[in-house]
Amino acid sequence: MKNLKQILTAMYLCMALAAAASPVRQRLHDDWQFRQARLNNWYPATVPGTVHTDLMANRIIEDPYFRLNERGVQWVDKEDWIYETHFEAGADLLARERIELVFEGLDTYADVYLNDEKILTTDNMFRRWRTEVKRLLRPGENALKVYFHSPIKVDLPKYDSLPYRYEAINDQSANGGLFDKRVSVFARKAGYHYGWDWGPRLVTSGIWRPVYLEGWNGIRISDVFYRQEEVTAERARVQVEVEIDAVREQPRAVVTVTAPGEGIEASVTTPLRPGVNRVTVPLDIASPKRWWTRELGEPHLYEFRTSVAAGDASDSRTTRIGLRSLRLVREKVSDGTTFRFELNGEPLFAKGANYIPCDVFLPRVTRAVYEKTIDDAAAVNMNMLRVWGGGVYEDDVFYELCDERGILVWQDFMFACSIYPAEGAWLENVRLEAEDNIRRLRNHPSIAVWCGNNECNDAWFGWGWNARYTKQGHPEYDKIIDTQFKRQYYEVLPEAVAAFSPGTPYHPSSPWSCYEGTSENSEGDTHFWKVWHSRAPIADYNTTRSRFFSEYGFQSFPEYASVLRFAPEERDWDIESEVMMAHQRGGSFANMRIRQYLEDEYWPARDFRTFLYMSHVLQGDAIKTAIEAHRRDKPYCWGSLFWQHNDCWPVASWASRDWYGRWKAQHYFARPAFDDLLVSPCTANGRLEVFLVSDRRETVRGKLETTVLKMDGTVLSKNTRSVTLAPNAVRKVHSADIAGLLHGCSPGEAIVVTKFTTGGRRYSNIGYFAPQKELALPEADIRWSAEPTAEGYAVTLTSDRFVRAAWLSLDGNEHFEDNYFDLLPGVGRTVGVSTKLSRDEFDRLLRITHLQQTR
């Protein structure tokens, strides 16, 4: 018993010593208050947070997302704001040799005071700020104050001082009362805060990411980089580069890397000098479990623990790593240059969307929102998201979820559709921003490529910006800006990627194929906007080629239940109403453009609610057409990322999911279009052609069934054949003369149903022989029944005639597992829905809408 007590006492002392030796953190998120700098009234504040959300919480402004309220809050960005808190530093923290104050994010121009002494001045929303504060901290109460300067007042003098203009095409300066003074280019701040063609102008400020005190004794791990030199099925060679801060010289430090449960361990012993030390621990892993995108395999993650011990000081850090090799293959071929990603030696067709921030007020984006956003991408078979350059480098949780779900990330640097003053202090600020974020994100297996910007290269060379001042007699201004442009995107940013994430591809701009020119379809990536912006017909998606489509899109409105959330008044329910025009930022013509396309491709909607539904079907059909065309064009084309996955506020936009998280038709249509096997019927030159597309790593064998039906279910022709398809290949598996298939039936009265069955799973698709507006859609008798399930109900629909785009809704947040689907005559379709509605409520609220009803 006595020995047991001695052992327990010794264990306790060891644990206590280890705890005392390890770094500690004290979060500073409590008891904040804020005020307008020129006024004296203090109000409670939330940290992390923003000025706008704090003003809303204190009922000083109304929700700017509701109706026209955005207009009434434009004064906020012209004011300075002060945030303040008082705190007591813990005794354990105060006992540490080094103590730093760390702000993970300050938006944007701020002075920080601790106990009335200025300790920090910031000018970049995207950087982490840390400063030594031990000498200033007191036992008892301490005062921390952050003075936020108006980004407008800081940057207007910069704009006024220049004889030339830096362009920023999406900056909604007029909405902010600044006329044409687009000052967003001067701030290292999220560009979309100043407005975009899908977002409001809400230029906010605040402590937008966590703030804390960090104290440590002796040593601290400041960074760990798992540099993967070689990853194959047989072995993985990894150099673990550990950065250690040491207060004083340490003659002997042991640095250890382990993967508990995986049988992986390695260590080195080294002396440490005062300051920053870099130590490398080599790992050699036999038969590694590699990380794959979700359709190619398992996205396996190792949990590595890096620890350092020197005397009585120690620190450790845990990092989840996916072992994989990834290349961006850009090889000269006879008809251009390839542009494809290769994962673990396998060519990968990128399927996904462009991602924008989930809110203008970023601290409101919870983990649950991130989870739904990424899960919704995975649910429709996406394997890549492009983090667009006008937003932010996302929170860690975003990349962690992509790692877990097997989704690659195309990561833009935060520059978009603008030209920036890239010289001097600005450029050094950008360099530090790049280093900060590359270091933070480089261990994520999901990071596939760093891209210099969004559309800046196109803007400078393709939109005429590079010759504007030459035409005005001042070519020297164009030369100045061109030099700055080249320095930022062709020197500073690629040098940062090479230095801090060697081996990760860098792409100068999106779209891009060469420096002095816009993108070419035979090389690089393409933003294809002739459909929509240039009013080209949707059918043009079938004939336009590119190596990689990194943007294309089509607009729609949110559904009716979503519209009611931000526009509940009946007078708003018109696409030309003031509210609907305010919640459309794609130009004053954009709502009319949806209507024009609708009337060109379908027919006029009879009322507002019908218009919303039809806009979904129109958008879904358009993007489905594009995705299938891109996939049929493999191996010329290797990527299809539509614009866009999400919204940052309630708005008519190109998003496949609205701001409330409701799926539009486009999102449902993306699931089969992005599946690992696609059967794709199309018509051209009087022939029906059926293509089979595989993204699988193995040969596929199965049965293809092609059936031509009349709308009442009468079979006009049927063909069944066995098909073998090589790995990662495309094959035309059926071709027939359309006239021979229809047997005299009008093209508008028939459909083609294609089904491919392999391994017990069926892949199907429906095609048409006539444009949608020429389809002779019949009146149909739809019947439905519902059976209770653990989550809600399973709803089964049947119809005596073909039904186009059946949409099930409950006018709530309920999500149907499938929707906007075509019903074949006499063939039942069962879909599940999660809901807590009683059976009586469900029966009363269920609404079934289909295209036949809209004429």
Q: Where does each model-flagged region fall?
A:
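Hydrophobic faces of well-ordered beta-strands that scaffold small-molecule active sites
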Residues: K351-A353, L385-V387, V409-Q411, G452, ...
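The substrate-binding groove and active-site-proximal loops of carbohydrate-active enzymes
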Residues: M125, D197-P200, T293, N354-R367, ...
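Loop/turn elements at helix/coil->beta-strand transitions in domains of secreted/extracellular proteins
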Residues: E141, L348, A378-L385, D403-L408, ...
